[in-house]
From Swiss-Prot:
GO terms for molecular function: ATP binding; single-stranded DNA binding. Belongs to the RecF family. Pfam families: SMC_N (PF02463). This is DNA replication and repair protein RecF. GO terms for biological process: DNA replication; DNA synthesis involved in DNA repair; double-strand break repair; SOS response. The RecF protein is involved in DNA metabolism; it is required for DNA replication and normal SOS inducibility. RecF binds preferentially to single-stranded, linear DNA. It also seems to bind ATP. It comes from the Bacteria. InterPro entries: DNA-binding_RecF, DNA-binding_RecF_CS, P-loop_NTPase, RecF/RecN/SMC_N, RecF_2. ATP binds at G29, L30, N31, G32, V33, G34, K35, T36. Its main location: cytoplasm. One of its GO terms (cellular component) is cytoplasm. Keywords: ATP-binding, Cytoplasm, DNA damage, DNA repair, DNA replication, DNA-binding, Nucleotide-binding, SOS response. It is found in: Cytoplasm.
Length: 349
């Protein structure tokens, strides 16, 4: 459980500290005061990434030299300092130089309005989801993914520089290396999706009218991947890129057997993604034997009272949960309330 959050120059929060004393934390305030920034800081401290922007320096307050996040979680101090030139990660004040050694020390599951892109967005956004979640629990996956990206970059560079290439020896060597790593990533993604579908079934025993399923859509089968790499060299040379592989995978979220992208309303889409995140939470617990922290940004908006109550009833008491909202919280639940105004703590009780 996170017991302390301390931020410096992070977004619009210049000097912010709050102590946490309950598993359920409700962060209230008007739009623009920094509610989402608190959740982003926790996500950043856990994953070294922002869920909002691919430009890391955007997290540094304007005209400041750095931003920092300090979290105390189960007596362990997590700290990440971001400058325009890079970032520095420490655990209990000892520097962790390899990001692969840092990721997974603190595990989080995040829901934000942007996550509707898991249904409506591009395949690259869905692949990013697969990678981020698997990286948190599997060092092997992270290592394989980094290797795959490195080999893919080499192969694509070779394809671009040698448009008249006729000797495919080195191209085939890179193809075999890509295949060896790629099929391991394929297997982990497939197992991950199968595991989430099992979690969906468990959740659906309580809510039988809400059927969600995840369908893996690999770009190419394991059996055909190596064959493609060894027989489609001319095609890859023409397009100057590797045209098949796990870097082009996708998945669909199905609602009552239909593609949610085409069949689900905005409100239903939010619930589908929420269901996905709750399943993910339970999967992480099963695999790692630890409880991930659930971060919910503006999760209650666009949900009617019945759906709000349905959602709140599903929150496990075993996980720490942070929720941002501009709405009053209904129901008899025990929580810590933090009210933000102009980036400062007005009330935390």
């Amino acid at each position: 459980m996170i017991t302390s959050i301390e931020l410096r120059n992070f977004r619009n929060l210049e000097n912010y500290k709050v102590l946490i004393n309950k598993p359920l934390v409700i962060i209230q305030g008007l739009n623009g005061v920094g509610k989402t920034s608190i959740l982003e800081s926790i996500y950043f401290a856990a994953t070294t990434k922002s869920h909002r922007s691919s430009v890391e320096k955007d997290m540094i307050q304007y005209d400041k030299p750095y931003a920092s996040v300090k979290l105390i979680e189960d007596s362990k101090l997590h700290e990440i300092v971001l400058t325009p030139n890079g970032k520095r990660t420490t655990i209990n004040k000892s520097e962790v130089r390899k990001i692969s050694d840092y990721i997974g020390q603190l595990r989080v599951v995040m829901f934000a309005p942007e996550d509707l892109m898991l249904i409506k967005g591009s395949p690259s956004e869905r692949r990013y989801f697969l990678d981020m979640e698997l990286m948190q629990v599997s060092k092997t996956y992270l290592r394989n993914l980094n290797s795959y990206k490195k080999i893919l970059k080499q192969r694509n560079a070779l394809l671009k520089k040698n448009r008249n290439l006729t000797d495919y020896t080195f191209l085939n060597i890179l193809g075999e290396q890509l295949y060896d790593v790629g099929i391991q990533i394929f297997d982990e993604r497939q197992k991950f999706i199968e595991a989430l579908n099992q979690k969906f079934k468990t959740i659906q025993t309580k809510y039988k009218d809400f059927e969600v399923e995840m369908l893996y859509e690999p770009n190419v089968t394991k059996e055909n991947f190596l064959k493609h790499l060894k027989t489609k060299q001319k095609q890859d040379i023409m397009y100057e890129t590797t045209t098949a592989g796990i870097h082009k995978d996708d998945f669909k979220l199905l609602y009552k057997g239909l593609n949610a992208k085409d069949s689900a309303s905005q409100g239903t889409s939010r619930l589908i993604v929420i269901e996905l995140k709750l399943a993910l939470l339970e999967w992480i617990k099963e695999v790692t034997k630890t409880d991930a922290i659930l971060l919910l940004d503006d999760v209650l908006s666009e949900l009617d009272l019945e759906r709000q109550n349905l959602f709140m009833s599903q929150l496990s008491k075993n996980h720490q949960v942070f929720i941002t909202t501009a709405l009053p919280i209904n129901g008899h639940i025990d929580f810590q309330k933090i009210v933000l105004q102009e980036g400062e703590t007005i009330n935390a009780k």
